[in-house]
Amino acid sequence: GEIYLSGEDVCKLLHISKRTLQQYRDDKILPYIQIGGKIIYKESDILTILEQNYISNNTHHI
């Protein structure tokens, strides 16, 4: 099944502050689920965003 993360979990995973996490929500960078006053994140969404922003430094010099 799907794994859901708290904001605190996401901050630790991404090494960001709660304010930065709020900014990511405001800028629609991270999708989230709001149930009542609680906000949670799908782990798969976080991993997808990390993959989409992966920058490889594998450059080949001739």
Located regions from the model:
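Polyanion-binding surface elements
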Residues: 1-19, 23, 52
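Short, solvent-exposed alpha-helical "recognition" segments
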Residues: 27-33
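Short, hydrophobic secondary-structure boundary micro-motifs
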Residues: 1, 33, 58-59
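A short, Lys/Arg-enriched interface patch at domain edges and termini
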Residues: 46-62
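Flexible coil/turn residues that form the inter-helical turn or adjacent wing/linker of helix-turn-helix
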Residues: 3, 28, 39
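Short Lys/Arg-enriched helix C-cap and helix-to-coil transition segments
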Residues: 33-39
